[in-house]
Amino acid sequence: MKAALLIDRGVLRVAGDPARHFLHNLVTANVETLTPGHARYAALLTPQGKIIADFFVVEAPADDGGGFFIDAPKALVPDLVQKLNFYKLRAKVTIEPLYALAVLAAWDGIGATEYGLDYRDPRLPALGQRVLLPPDVATEAAADLGAELVDASDYEAHRIALGVPRGGVDFIYGDVFPHDADLDKLGGVDFKKGCFIGQEVVSRVEHRGTARNRIVPVAFDAHAAEDGVAVTAGDKTVGTMGSSAGNIGLAMLRVDRVADAMAAGVPLLAGGIPMKLREGAIADFLKDPKA
């Protein structure tokens, strides 16, 4: 079992009696049915349905003050606090950043620790679990879990191998819809919960099957192409390269154009380097461009 302190993650807290209802009406996940010690992968969208931030909503135990922790990209925490405060209106909720907390990820096994609040990563079982804790006890928490404490780059390689996108790296906040970033494939959108900000646009894409962009696992014969370079098929641009580790990576691709290229036997190139699609945890939609 391995564990890594994710220095790019931050934590905020939403508390108060209306906190559950408040979050449920805003984010893409179902917060009403969330139980203490468990998490939901979710996003806050613009009214036009584009992702402002993706994060985990974790219900705090009652003996820890209740409410909800939000495990989010650290760089987005101040803006997320501001945005949630904008939406709270007269709701009697408090929204505050918890700069004393960090996030530890653990995988290749499941353990338990008394050094923080641990929960299973709701996106994929293979992603293991996460722990909200003060960063200075990361070593003790890893030992408690029975895990070897490794560098965050090991976790990145594991994430990329599973084909799981990372916000701000594999997709740009404010530019993409949930389907573009595979949130629907990773349990990040509850299509049965009813209204949330941007819900009409997202539901329309889901029911019409009109998602054009997807983030997919890719591979190279040697080292992967650099983040941000164009992916081409012949003289057409079909996507953009994202994060990578060794000879594997992720790329945001126009699924219809890739399907056409594959049918015509046209090779894919990323920054001029031959690239192929690989079998991954969330690549099945490539078999059906309408997925």
Task: Describe the function of each predicted region.
Residues 24, 28-32, 78, 82-90, ...:
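Short, intrinsically disordered, mixed-charge
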Residues 151-152, 158-184, 221:
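Short, conserved active-site entrance elements at the starts or edges of catalytic domains
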Residues 5-26, 94-108, 210-220:
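Short glycine-/aliphatic-rich beta-strand segments at the starts of folded cytosolic domains
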